[in-house]
Amino acid sequence: MAFSFQVSKMNSFDNYNAAIHPKHDLISVNAPVFGKDAKLSPHLAIVLADKGFMLEQVCLPWRYFTDRGFVVEFVIAESIFPPRPPKPNDSYMTGWKSHVLGASKEILDIYSVLCTLNEFNNPKCYRSNGFTFDNFSAVFITGGRNPFVREMLEDPLLHASLVPYIHSCRTIQPDEEVKDNRKIKVLGAISQGAAAIYLAEPNINMKTTTIPAWMERSNSFLNPTPDNSTYPYAATIIPKDKYVSGPYRRVAFTYQDENYYYISGRSNKDIGELSKKMYLMYKQAYKDLNASLRERRRRSTSNRRNSGI
């Protein structure tokens, strides 16, 4: 663990119940930002359910982007009362499933740090008045099959907030005349999280991967009721011409769209690579924007010279 900035703030915990019942008696602190100014640093929103999220899908992106100078904030549906940190899916935290499908010691360590942060203990709420994703440079949508996650992914208020952001992620073309106020916007989704995009904007010209039906079906057999439910599989929600299934085996697989700064993954196995590629996509978007602005200035200068100004 490289959390030198907060190791002293962590309490001892055990692998089974630390992530379910975080035991910290410290005042929440702000996450570190390694840039010169938090206000100037890019902001990432991790969209998650307040209960039942997958630890890997939240902890690893937070760690990766925080280490690269992002301000990472968390977005849930509405305020939690009585106040508590968002809770992960506890069906994988105890018993035999914790050994087969549960989070690693590293992930549990990261979660114990998250539970000391203001950003995690007081997440933003997309149902609140005036909320917008426009304040973020990157948005990452988590997935899951349990009722709490499903409610979030199908929420029309989440869709309403996502639609304008999705369109702001359109790829900048080399010859495009960008506006002065064009901002860098990138989007990522893991497993069922991709379904929220197509429920929000079913006709968008964007391709994605998500957890394949065969993988989601096999996973559901390991989940207790009501997780093993009649929810439609995520892959069936996405239009066939926009769905990229990936290999028919449990290997890491991500897919980046050509028309939008959007990248997606299928399962927790992909989350590390997905975080890395999403960050590289952000850097590429920044380069594309600067290149377009330089080209616009070059054309403007050339036109003035040709007109004798």
Curated annotation (Swiss-Prot):
GO cellular component term, pick one: cytoplasm
GO molecular function terms listed in the Swiss-Prot or TrEMBL record: catalytic activity
One Pfam family of this chain: ThiJ_like
Stated family: To S.pombe SpAC14C4.04.
Name of the protein this chain belongs to: Uncharacterized protein C18G6.12c
